[in-house]
Every structure is written in structure tokens, then in C-alpha cells.
Curated annotation (Swiss-Prot):
A Gene Ontology BP annotation from the UniProt entry: 2-oxoglutarate metabolic process
GO molecular function, one term: flavin adenine dinucleotide binding
Organism: Methanocaldococcus jannaschii (strain ATCC 43067 / DSM 2661 / JAL-1 / JCM 10045 / NBRC 100440)
Listed InterPro entries: Class-I_Pyr_Nuc-Dis_Oxidored, FAD/NAD-bd_sf, FAD/NAD-binding_dom
Name of protein: Uncharacterized protein MJ0636
Length: 397
């Protein structure tokens, strides 16, 4: 058990996304009386509008890409399934996941309240944890736009799409809808995917992976915003709601914490949100028991961008690197005919400090991250074959 003896304190967690649910479950599991407030649906942005939903779209796009490679010509989504049918099937899967999340949350003793948490509720609780997500604009320069919450409700596939933003979500949407057969234009003020700094990797992405038009000109953007034939999607980062100290305590508040995307100075993706949720749960216990508080650790966070190739990266990108050939297996077999990407492991002062990969099995990157931390996960390593894992051959003892 994380906390030891059960507690009788009453705690409100506001928001049932990855951060809030993680905090609530950890606290309830260890004896706290926890009410989890959710005004929408369990799962937060991740399940309902973000990474999980986009995974469904991406998997369909990968099917289309493989068929296009095999046929030697572009296959469009509507030749296989209507966009309306695809959306409905994804929604059914989301419902199943949502029901599972709700069940496991309640089984741990969390009381889920499907209503808005209001100021009048504050006096009913000893501690409050906010995990409410970001605020997102609903218009851009006065023009109505779709946001991440609108896209799952679309039932007709747009012919022309303008996407505003240059980050991971914007790029993933642009890639998916282009794979579906839409004419996609992405506007970004500078360049896309800024965290990828390796110029050789960027050059490969632009030539081999990016399948949509990118513009930077404001006048061209304005013309497209005025063009009624374009569906406009705004995919820029929203704004956090709460500023906290290093221990995720909300500033100028007593016994109030915050975690996840609602942080002005934190959040970022689902694993980070969960980690912050765990830190908040631990710190509430520590505060009660006069123990030192802990800080969230934002070092060496693995990240993934799912385009026609999956790009994953962690750590530093330096000028001292080794290029590793891709391995062929589940997820990239037919891509051998069109390109399976490049991979690099980066070094500094003789030590491994990072990597960028284009392998389908992005899930193995956290194990490589442990190697950067000095934990030899590849000692006596036995692989599954065939595998697209590029690391084990390089580092197995």
C-alpha cells in the first residue's frame, strides 16, 4: 500500500481525466474518502477527444496506406468505409473503454459525481485536487473553427481542411485526413514539430512522411479562413488554469493541489498527467504526516508522434550519433516498399543521452529510457521475433 493506514479525510478531485482519476484511485485505494467530480465523461480529453480517439483514426489511416502501397495507387477512406461509419465504430470502442474505466474507478472506492464542482462544495472537503484540463479557444481571429471536441462529432469527411497549429496534434490530424483523401493545408507561424531538431531527421520527414501542404504566410492563411469550402480546425495548445509551486500546491490556496493539463506550468501529455496525479496523491499524504513533499520529475519523458511512420524520441539530440537501420516486423512490413524511416541514438561524453526512432513499437522507448538512466535492461535480454525493436541488438550483452 502506498499510504499505510486508512484515512478518514474527505477529498474532492475535480476532473476524471488521466491526472484526476490517477489521484482519486491512489487515494481511495489507501483509505481516503474520495469524490471524483466530472461534468462531461470519464477519461478526459485523452480518451474522448485526444490520443485514444486519434489512435482509432490513425489505425484506419494505416490500413489505407498499406492498401495504397499494395495496389500501387492512392486508396481513399470512402472506398472502404464511410467517415460516418468509422466515427460510429470508434465511438463504440470509446464507450467500452469508458465503461471499463468507470468500473475500475468505482471498484477502488471512488465516488463518481457527474456534475460540476462549484464553490459551494469547497467547505465539504479537507483537500481539493483540480485536474480540469485546459481552456481552449473556440474561434481564431474572429473566425469560427472546430476544436478537438468537435471532430469526433463530424459525420461527413470534409473535402478541404485548414489546420491551424504546428504541434503534435495538428500534425497528426493533418497526416490522418490527408491519408483519408482530403486536401489538407496546415498553417504554422514557424515550423512544425519543433522538438525534433535533428536536421537529417527533419529532412526525411518533410520528403518522405509529411503528406500535406504547409504554409507560413499570414495573407494566405487569411484567404483560406475566408474560403467557405474549407473546414477549419484549430489545433493549438490551450491555456492552463492554475499556477502551482514545485510540489503542485495551488498558489495562495490552502490544501488545494492541481495536476495535469490544467497546470499553467505543467501537464503536456497523458503520462505526464498521470505522474503529476501520483505526485499530488503522495504529497497530500506527506503533508498530513509532516513528511517532506516530493516534486514531479520531468526529465527524460518519452514522446511519440503517430504519422504514416511512428516517430518517437527521448532525451537530447546531439551531433554525436549512430544511425541504426530499421527492423522489419508487425506494423511496417509493407512499408519496406515505400520507406521504413531512419533511427538515431545520440551520445555525449561517451554516454547515451537520447534517441529518435521511426519504429512501429513506440511502447519500447521507455525501456530504452531506463538504459539512459543507467539501468541495464538489455542484460540477458530475450526478444520476440520478428520485432521492430532497434535497441536490443545494439545493447544486448
Amino acid at each position: 500500500m502506498l499510504f499505510g493506514e486508512s484515512m478518514t479525510l474527505k477529498i474532492a478531485v475535480v476532473g476524471a481525466g488521466p491526472a484526476g482519476r490517477t489521484s482519486a484511485m491512489f487515494l481511495a485505494k489507501n483509505g481516503f474518502d474520495v469524490d471524483l467530480f466530472e461534468k462531461d465523461r470519464v477519461g478526459g480529453t485523452c480518451l474522448n477527444y485526444g490520443c485514444t480517439y486519434i489512435t482509432g483514426l490513425r489505425e484506419m489511416a494505416d490500413i489505407i496506406n498499406n492498401l495504397s502501397i499494395l495496389k500501387g495507387e492512392k486508396v481513399h477512406l470512402e472506398e472502404i468505409i464511410s467517415f460516418k461509419e468509422l466515427q460510429e465504430k470508434i465511438n463504440k470502442i470509446q464507450d467500452r473503454i469508458r465503461n471499463k474505466l468507470e468500473k475500475e474507478t468505482k471498484e477502488l472506492g471512488v465516488n463518481i459525481k457527474y456534475k460540476e464542482f462549484k464553490n459551494k462544495h469547497k467547505n465539504d472537503y479537507d483537500y481539493i485536487i483540480y485536474a480540469t484540463g485546459r481552456n481552449y479557444p473556440s474561434n481564431y481571429n474572429g473566425y469560427e473553427v472546430l476544436t478537438h471536441k468537435d471532430i469526433p462529432n463530424l459525420r461527413e469527411l470534409p473535402e478541404n481542411i485548414l489546420i491551424i497549429g504546428g504541434g503534435v496534434v495538428a500534425t497528426e490530424y493533418a497526416s490522418i485526413f490527408s491519408d483519408f483523401g482530403c486536401n489538407v493545408v496546415l498553417y504554422t507561424r514557424s515550423k512544425i514539430l519543433k522538438e525534433i531538431k535533428d536536421e537529417e531527421i527533419r529532412d526525411y520527414l518533410m520528403k518522405k512522411v509529411i503528406n500535406f501542404k504547409i504554409i507560413n504566410d499570414k495573407e494566405e492563411l487569411e484567404n483560406l479562413l475566408k474560403d467557405e469550402s474549407y473546414t477549419k480546425i484549430l489545433a493549438i495548445g490551450g491555456n492552463g488554469r492554475f499556477k502551482t509551486d514545485d510540489y503542485l500546491r495551488v498558489l495562495n490556496e490552502e490544501k488545494v493541489y492541481a495536476c495535469g493539463d490544467c497546470l499553467i506550468n505543467g501537464g503536456g501529455n497523458t503520462p505526464i498527467s498521470r505522474m503529476e496525479g501520483r505526485v499530488v496523491a503522495q504529497n497530500i499524504y506527506n503533508e498530513i504526516n509532516n513528511k517532506p513533499l516530493i516534486k514531479p520529475n520531468y526529465e527524460l519523458i518519452p514522446k511519440t508522434i503517430r504519422l504514416s511512420l511512428t516517430i518517437s524520441y527521448v532525451g537530447k539530440q546531439t551531433n554525436n550519433y549512430k544511425t541504426i537501420r530499421s527492423c522489419v516486423g508487425k506494423g511496417n512490413f509493407f512499408k519496406v516498399l515505400s520507406g521504413v524511416g531512419i533511427n538515431k541514438i545520440y551520445y555525449e561524453d561517451g554516454k547515451i543521452v537520447g534517441a529518435i526512432t521511426m519504429m512501429p513499437c513506440a511502447e519500447i522507448l521507455p525501456y530504452f529510457t531506463q538504459l539512459i538512466r543507467g539501468i541495464d535492461v538489455y542484460n540477458n535480454f530475450m526478444e520476440v521475433h520478428p520485432s521492430t525493436d532497434i535497441f536490443y541488438k545494439e545493447f544486448r550483452s
